[in-house]
Regions:
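Structural preference for solvent-exposed beta-strand-turn elements
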Residues: 1-371
Length: 371
């Protein structure tokens, strides 16, 4: 195999596909990046056995063929190349020679016949959504996905698609995040909805390679796998299976207290209070709503913080405490001018949602404080 391509093109491709590499691969071959040169393109593929990412780059292919090179080392080497054009030639012993201007390197490879073929969904339910919209949806909920849990289903994110809207739902046991995209979706075969759980790691990596464009990302699902295609990139992953939590049952039907406050003011006050909260044993922030005042406070052995802001309160006064990180994660993902918080008591969930509309919804469990 031999081809010549632009160094930046090669590096962009490697930076994309190596996101699928595992820190602890189950097989040595999965430490590598698979290269397939044919026609006027080279396909780069990496996989951890569950997640695979493939990207096609333009190249001047002199000799078609396949190769597997050490993924991280090849990427770092490509990053250090002087620029311009790079020529890569792989011989019968699987070793690669890499030539770029005055730079010459040789890299031991592996047998490409040992590399597993990328699994794709050939037939299934297809959903198309603009890349920028999907990227935004992921960024608004991914923080609420459980990183470790006895229930593996919570380490994923629920995607629900109906003819008029799509929803991403994440739940880690302490927080619930829902982000909607209201737009028409064509569901094949008269289906009324699609409901799948995508691994959190997959969504994290997708959000980093999706473009800021209204060009579509095509998602194809079967019962156990999803294939996503956008631009010159294809991603394939297994889906999580099992009984997910019915999040609708968690959402309160009504509220005793509603508070409106300036979102930027609340965020800045919480950021300052968090500095002190992190020094305490429980990382707590207290919020006290009374009359037209919101008091945000935290304390530790080293000191304390008290911030007061104006608020519009409807209903009963309330004092409630939250884990500083959980409340910070939520508020940083809101862009509305006004922050709308709804409560029933200081031991029941707080819901943060738009003052008008239903684009997003966040639910946070408070921390019970004994005084």
């Amino acid at each position: 195999m031999q081809f010549t391509t632009n160094v930046q093109l090669l590096l962009d491709g490697l930076n994309t596909v190596t996101r699928a590499l595992s820190a602890r691969p189950t097989k040595q071959i999965l430490e590598g990046v698979h290269l397939s040169a044919a026609g006027e393109h080279v396909k780069l593929t990496c996989s951890d056995g569950n997640l695979s990412i493939e990207m096609s780059i333009s190249a001047d292919v002199k000799e078609e063929g396949t190769a597997v090179l050490p993924g991280r080392l090849f990427t770092e080497l490509s990053r250090k190349l002087p620029g311009g054009e790079v020529t890569i030639r792989v011989g019968e012993n699987h070793a690669a020679s890499i030539r770029c201007l005055s730079s010459k390197s040789n890299l031991a490879g592996m047998n490409p016949t040992d590399y597993p073929e990328m699994a794709r969904v050939a037939e299934g339910t297809t959903v198309r959504i603009p890349q920028d919209k999907l990227k935004e949806m992921i960024s608004r909920v991914v923080f609420a996905i459980a990183t470790e849990d006895n229930r593996q289903i919570l380490t994923g994110c629920l995607l629900e698609v109906e003819p008029t809207e799509a929803r991403l739902v994440a739940l880690d046991g302490f927080r619930l995040a829902i982000q909607k995209a209201v737009m028409p979706f064509e569901l094949p075969g008269g289906k009324e909805n699609v409901r799948v759980v995508i691994p959190g790691r997959v969504l994290n990596e997708m959000s980093k390679v999706l473009g800021d464009t209204d060009e579509y990302c095509t998602l194809v699902f079967d019962q156990s796998r999803m294939t996503a295609s956008f631009g010159t990139t294809t991603l394939s992953t297994v889906l999580l299976t099992g009984e997910d939590i019915d999040y609708r049952k968690i959402l309160p039907a009504s509220f005793r207290t509603t508070a409106l406050a300036d979102r930027v003011g609340v965020q800045n006050a919480i950021d300052r209070a968090s500095l002190m909260a992190r020094e305490g044993k429980n990382n707590l922030i207290r919020m006290s709503f009374s009359g037209d005042t919101l008091a945000i406070s935290s304390n530790a052995e080293l000191g304390d913080v008290l911030e007061e802001l104006e608020t519009e309160l409807t209903g009963d006064p309330i004092e409630i405490a939250f884990n500083a990180k959980y409340i910070t994660d939520v508020i940083r993902n809101i862009t509305d001018e006004k922050l709308c918080m709804r409560f029933n008591s200081n031991v029941s969930p707080c819901v943060i949602a738009p003052q008008e509309g239903e684009d997003y919804l966040y639910l946070i469990l408070p921390v019970r404080v004994f005084t």
